[in-house]
Amino acid sequence: VGFEAPAQAEIAEAFAWYEEKSYGLGGDFLRVIAAAAEQLARNPEAFPPTRGRFRRILLRRFPYALHFELLTNHRVSVLACLHHRRSPARWPGP
């Protein structure tokens, strides 16, 4: 599972926000991201396409989703980590 630069930036932003709210909460957020990445590595096809070739996995405990693409060699590319309240039209997209 690879994380593209925009997804990494969004994760870092969310981490900082949660850590500011409560020390340690940012670490919890990163652990949930890691658990989701493990799920994607094991069985990415368990998550059906939502828009064309893009798929998403909802994070546990946090109102975020990882938007990803399943590449032809069965690699997973995480394109975005978006809060549920953000416009779904913003990402994923071509």
Language-model regions: role of each:
Residues 1-30:
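Arg/Lys-rich, positively charged N-terminal/basic patches that mediate binding to nucleic acids
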Residues 22, 44-51, 85-88:
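Short, charge-rich, low-complexity interaction segments located
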Residues 35, 42-76:
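Basic/aromatic recognition patch in beta-strand/loop cores that engages polyanionic ligands
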Residues 69-94:
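Enriched for short, Lys/Arg-rich terminal
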